[in-house]
């Protein structure tokens, strides 16, 4: 009494015929390439908003490590493929936007040489892009994939393909993404023994009658990141237009660590001369304001005095971080501890040493492709980036 069941599985053509963007900016099936290309879609990039969208690649690409800086919200990130290749040089991958390498105008990150050096690391240039404008990201690793860009691509290539107008339809998209952040893991501190002497940072003194209630976690706040985006896409078989606006307003977990980004993007693609000539023009504006990026070193870093605050002492008294000096007729910092470690009141740092930074970036690109035949074409690209 056996019964035969015929089961037919539907092909998942999206997986079987996966299309990726190659080093030349040409779309090909992944299985036809002789080198490794991994692609990340826009949905994966924007699912959880980050002030720097590069951080959203973490865990999505095999063999790639995303090193986020500790500067705070909006800080720069490095994309390291298949391990560190240089101890002192730049291990970051090359970014290519719509077939054109992106110049890196960020300052090099170096370790401070003494206690009084150090500054918060600003966001890298790629972080100024609006993630909602990205169609997909292809990660190219290995010498074959990056050969087109020479030695600049020795550490790999991150190919970014931006959106353009859709043929035959008009669509409007509006989105909002709000995320919250808080410290996940903090160092553990003893609260049994007090200061060795008055004004000292060392907590190797006598046993406290009442365990210290000091908790560095009270210094931090809940971070908020609000991202808004609106876009318009329209087009015909001869002309496609894309327009987008984006805003990112974020507050870090340290007071006054603020980040604001405003983006405007316009792109137009047109076909001429019996569809043999394709012109692609785009303009991107990114305006970024940031402040109070956590510094390296000691003197400008609020975390070091926070963690070295002596157990058993009253932390609330340093929250009133300034006192009036009648002799100098001005407000001065209140920090009743030794200056041997070049530390300052953490509240004084966050309130008075904000180090604001304002960056405007303009990127205009133009490309022209002429098809001589079905099997041969010539493409020219130009870019202004300032």
Regions found by a protein language model. Give the residues of each.
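Short acidic/polar hinge/loop motifs at secondary-structure boundaries
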Residues: 100-141
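Outer-membrane beta-barrel transmembrane strands
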Residues: 221-240, 245-248, 262, 346-386
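Short, acidic, small-residue-rich periplasmic hinge/interaction motif at the N-terminus
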Residues: 2-46, 54
């Amino acid at each position: 009494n056996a019964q035969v069941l015929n089961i037919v599985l539907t092909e998942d053509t999206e997986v079987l015929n996966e299309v990726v963007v190659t080093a030349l900016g040409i779309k090909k099936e992944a299985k036809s390439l002789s080198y490794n290309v991994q692609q990340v879609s826009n949905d994966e990039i924007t699912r959880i908003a980050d002030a720097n969208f590069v951080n959203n690649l973490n865990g999505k690409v095999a063999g790639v490590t995303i090193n986020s800086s500790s500067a705070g919200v909006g800080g720069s990130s490095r994309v390291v493929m298949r391990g560190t290749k240089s101890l002192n040089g730049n291990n970051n991958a090359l970014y290519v936007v719509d077939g054109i390498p992106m110049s890196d105008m960020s300052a090099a990150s170096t370790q401070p040489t003494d206690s009084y050096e150090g500054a918060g690391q600003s966001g890298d240039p790629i972080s100024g892009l609006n993630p909602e404008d990205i169609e997909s990201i292809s990660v190219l690793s290995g010498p074959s994939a990056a050969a087109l860009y020479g030695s600049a691509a020795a550490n790999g290539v991150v190919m970014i393909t931006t959106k353009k107008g859709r043929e035959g339809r008009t669509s409007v998209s509006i989105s909002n993404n709000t995320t919250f952040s808080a410290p996940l893991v903090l160092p553990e501190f003893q609260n049994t023994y007090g200061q060795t002497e008055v004004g000292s940072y060392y907590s190797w003194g006598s046993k406290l009658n009442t365990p210290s209630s000091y908790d560095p976690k009270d210094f931090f706040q809940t971070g908020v990141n609000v991202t808004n985006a609106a876009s318009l896409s329209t087009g015909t078989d001869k002309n496609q237009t894309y327009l987008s606006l984006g805003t990112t307003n974020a507050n870090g977990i340290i007071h006054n660590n603020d980040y604001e980004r405003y983006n405007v993007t316009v792109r137009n693609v047109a076909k001429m001369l019996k569809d043999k000539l394709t012109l692609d023009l785009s303009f991107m504006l990114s305006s970024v304001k940031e402040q109070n990026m956590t510094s390296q070193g000691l003197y400008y870093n609020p975390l070091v005095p926070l963690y070295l605050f002596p157990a058993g002492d009253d932390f609330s008294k340093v929250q009133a971080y300034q006192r009036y000096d009648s002799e100098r007729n001005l407000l001065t910092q209140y920090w009743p501890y030794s200056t041997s470690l070049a530390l300052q009141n953490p509240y004084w740092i966050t309130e008075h040493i904000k180090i604001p930074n304002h960056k405007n970036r303009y990127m205009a690109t133009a490309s022209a492709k002429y098809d001589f035949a079905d099997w041969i074409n010539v493409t020219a690209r130009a870019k202004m980036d300032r």
